[in-house]
Amino acid sequence: MVSTTKSTGSVTQIIGPVLDIAFPNGQLPKVFNALKVQSTDGTITCEVQQLLGDNKVRAVSMSSTEGLKRGVEVVDTGAPISVPVGTNTLGRIFNVLGEPVDNLGPVSSESTLPIHRPAPAFTKLETKPSIFETGIKVVDLLAPYRRGGKIGLFGGAGVGKTVLIMELINNIAKAHGGVSVFGGVGERTREGNDLYMEMKESKVINEDNLKESKVALVYGQMNEPPGARMRVGLTALTMAEYFRDINKQDVLLFIDNIFRFVQAGSEVSALLGRMPSAVGYQPTLATEMGALQERITSTTEGSITSIQAVYVPADDLTDPAPATTFAHLDATTVLSRNLAAKGIYPAVDPLDSTSTMLQPGIVGTDHYSTAQEVKSTLQRYKELQDIIAILGLDELSEEDRQTVSRARKIERFLSQPFFVAEVFTGSPGKYVSLEDAIKGFQMILKGELDDLPEQAFYLVGDIDEAIQKADSMKD
């Protein structure tokens, strides 16, 4: 008969967030089991990382180890860290252990799931690539997202990352009946708080009826120990998997920032006694990244589409952390400071953003040729800008002048009013279907709208709205 009594051990060594714990003979916990340590400030949860031999294990703490001392009692819970899942998590903020941290009381969840789970079996995967329509023109036309794919979001501070994220959360709920999970991994606490406040303001989180909210938030911020930052991504992913597998929904999983996940792993790695690899990163970098990324996928039941903010240290794309991330991405959305300065929002760079989905075999020749033509027009405009700056527009050939005029219209038509920004801008948000977006850009490229003023294309939804705006400008 299996004994149900939990084995207890004691702390023998403390090095920062890493603890060595001795257990009685034959009662060692398994790797990834959660351990509870009694400290003066309450209970600390740790996760077993290594079995050292000699009846000792090495574990990483999920919270601060200040005030701990050798000899403190440790209890093996007999299972990995488990977190609440389901609709009751919507509108709430959790920490890495799945405990609510928003002062709104406990979460009454019907079920919990362990954060370490295998990726879906190959037989359950959805193999046919399909486009995930976001309702945002520039994304759907030029760098479309794959349903169940992974998208890298690149952009500095203040170029509109947060607003873009909130718009995507809003659109997946309205157009796809889906929900979102936001994993804040090692970012600023202030930003986490701002995001929460903005979500309440734009009704992404419904304070009056939390279950009608469109997002669950999981935070492991910069001030947390590396153990929490290393695992908070898995906590968010586990909540997203429940919506996909049990509720059979389309889910958006945001990870901000995927670099901090790697960084936390490298902080812990040396303390666990592993030899560092290139640039001081952990030797298990690719394995850790793969274990997280392979669980983000489309199954026959539902999908998890993940949007990951990628910080590139010192703008070095060959750094092992971003380089390992790139291997998993299906699309990149690059936000440009130049476009933001011109007031073109979303400030997505149409020439730098890429997608593996933009192939005639997947999106169709109509979409593909329109996208390529839009890009080549914008590229030609970019090349001509130096000449225009020195000599002026009048010195260009007739053909180039026409290209510039159309490119400026395209640039403005790539902007769009967002639902979540209504509160700040006063102009109602627009969801533009892919079909309407393609139609609009084709009309501009064919020259059907050459006589319309370029201002008519700025911050509108579909092309009909631009034509109406031009008519009202005449009046």
From Swiss-Prot:
InterPro entries: AAA+_ATPase, ATP-synt_VA_C, ATP_synth_F1_bsu, ATPase_a/bsu_AS, ATPase_alpha/beta_chains, ATPase_F1/V1/A1_a/bsu_N, ATPase_F1/V1/A1_a/bsu_N_sf, ATPase_F1/V1/A1_a/bsu_nucl-bd. One of its GO terms (molecular function) is ATP binding. This is ATP synthase subunit beta, chloroplastic. It is found in: Plastid, Chloroplast thylakoid membrane. Produces ATP from ADP in the presence of a proton gradient across the membrane. The catalytic sites are hosted primarily by the beta subunits. It is an enzyme of class 7 (translocase). It is a peripheral membrane protein. Its EC number is 7.1.2.2. Keywords: ATP synthesis, ATP-binding, CF(1), Chloroplast, Hydrogen ion transport, Ion transport, Membrane, Nucleotide-binding, Plastid, Thylakoid, Translocase, Transport. F-type ATPases have 2 components, CF(1) - the catalytic core - and CF(0) - the membrane proton channel. CF(1) has five subunits: alpha(3), beta(3), gamma(1), delta(1), epsilon(1). CF(0) has four main subunits: a(1), b(1), b'(1) and c(9-12). ATP binds at G155, G156, A157, G158, V159, G160, K161, T162. NCBIfam families: atpD (TIGR01039). GO terms for cellular component: chloroplast thylakoid membrane; mitochondrion; proton-transporting ATP synthase complex. CDD domains: ATP-synt_F1_beta_C, ATP-synt_F1_beta_N, F1-ATPase_beta_CD. GO terms for biological process: proton motive force-driven mitochondrial ATP synthesis. It catalyses: ATP + H2O + 4 H(+)(in) = ADP + phosphate + 5 H(+)(out).
